[in-house]
Regions:
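Extracellular glycan-modifying ectodomains
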Residues: 1-377
């Protein structure tokens, strides 16, 4: 009897594994994990060339991991076990105070060589663009840097100030930098970043928008009147959650609804709408894509104030939630994601003849963005 009880956990485990394997065998391959928010490796095609150079073996290993029976459940189970053992860092994500999930950044993400190349390209592009436009640069700090007091005790983390010092030194002569670190730091006790996602919230974006308005000499009273949001979701689980399939508290998504009648053209005529929001994404695991329907190559937005100004915004996903604020302040707003568009910075200046330019990136994403180095050099 004792032997039976000793073997029981192993028997149960094998039964569960075989059951999951059987279920998976009867189902189709998955191409996307809504939990991890990423594409999954499907069964790779075999060829002699791919076997000899090792590409097939590498992809097949990824295929086995990604198509493992009940993968989403195992990711969650692994996280629970590591938490039970007292770990506070899982898959480069810290379990922080007040239920914040904070990414562990290192010099891998802030590679000095890539940063140097990107800053060189940024300085060169700003120098050209300033000849015909009013140019500003805004780098948004990571959540882990602004909320570093919420990190576990003695948790190692990248000292992001090194990046800002290099940025300041490179752009000091140009006088184009809008530093949002101080204002975000001043409001860090407010919900300026999502708990389960690496992006800032609409509130965090609004504080940055207020700083931008001050820098360009805009209507500050009008900008402050936009600090009114509507909650559209209370069950948002973001990218950081997806890495470990764990969260103690869901996020809410709030939006600013423009008083102006906007007209939005997607990707040079691919689609036309009257809003910067795609509410269909609220029914999916990728709720953050409610902002502009995800990252688009080009957005052309009109319907704002009639002042003859065109703002060219070169950005990453952090800018998606600031667009509704900016759209009202310009006769035309052109939004470009260089990661999605095979066009150089010089060509953008020729195509849209902007009167104003804002380059807005999250610091970690800018540090890793090789597309910026290539297209703005």
């Amino acid at each position: 009897m004792i032997r039976i009880f000793k073997r029981l956990p192993g028997v149960i485990f094998m039964v569960l594994l075989l059951g999951l394997a059987g279920k998976e065998a009867l189902s189709h391959q998955r191409t996307y994990s809504p939990v991890e928010k990423r594409e999954l490796q499907t069964r790779p095609e075999i060829s002699i060339t791919k076997v000899l150079d090792g590409r097939f073996q590498k992809k097949y290993e990824s295929y086995l991991r990604d198509q493992f029976p009940g993968r989403d459940h195992w990711v969650s189970f692994q996280t629970d076990m590591e938490l039970f053992m007292g770990k506070n860092e899982i898959h480069n994500v810290y379990i922080g105070k007040n239920h914040y999930l904070l990414e562990h950044y290192t010099e891998k993400e802030f590679d000095p060589q890539q940063i140097s190349k990107n800053l060189q390209a940024l300085e060169k592009f700003v120098g050209k663009a300033k000849q015909n436009a009013d140019v500003h640069v805004m780098m948004v700090p990571t959540k882990s840097w602004i909320l570093r007091e919420k990190l576990p005790a003695f948790a190692p983390h990248y000292k992001e100030q090194k990046f800002y010092d290099a940025l300041q030194q490179k752009l000091e002569k140009e006088d184009v930098l809008i530093s949002v670190e101080p204002v975000l730091d001043a409001h860090k006790e407010e919900e300026i970043y999502y708990r389960t996602d690496h992006h800032w919230t609409t509130l965090g974006a609004w504080y940055a928008y207020e700083q931008y308005t001050k820098a360009v000499g805009g209507d500050l009273q009008r900008a402050q009147g936009k600090k009114k949001f509507r909650c559209i979701s209370k069950d948002f689980y973001g990218t950081t959650y997806a890495k470990i399939n764990y969260a103690r508290q869901a996020d809410k998504i709030e939006i600013y609804e423009s008083a102006d009648k906007l007209r939005v053209v997607y990707n040079m005529g691919e689609k036309k709408t009257k809003t910067l929001y795609d509410f269909s994404f609220l029914k999916t695991a990728d709720q953050y894509s409610v902002f502009t329907g995800g990252n688009q190559a080009v957005l052309e937005i009109t319907g704002g104030i009639k002042n003859g100004k065109t703002l060219l915004l070169i950005k990453d996903s952090f800018a998606n939630s600031i667009l509704p604020f900016l759209a009202e302040d310009y006769e035309k707003l052109v939004v470009v994601d260089l990661r999605q568009l095979n066009v150089s910075g010089d060509r953008l200046l020729e195509m849209f003849s902007p009167t104003d330019i804002l380059i807005l990136y999250n610091s970690a994403q800018f540090a890793q963005d090789k597309e910026f180095e290539i297209k703005c050099n």
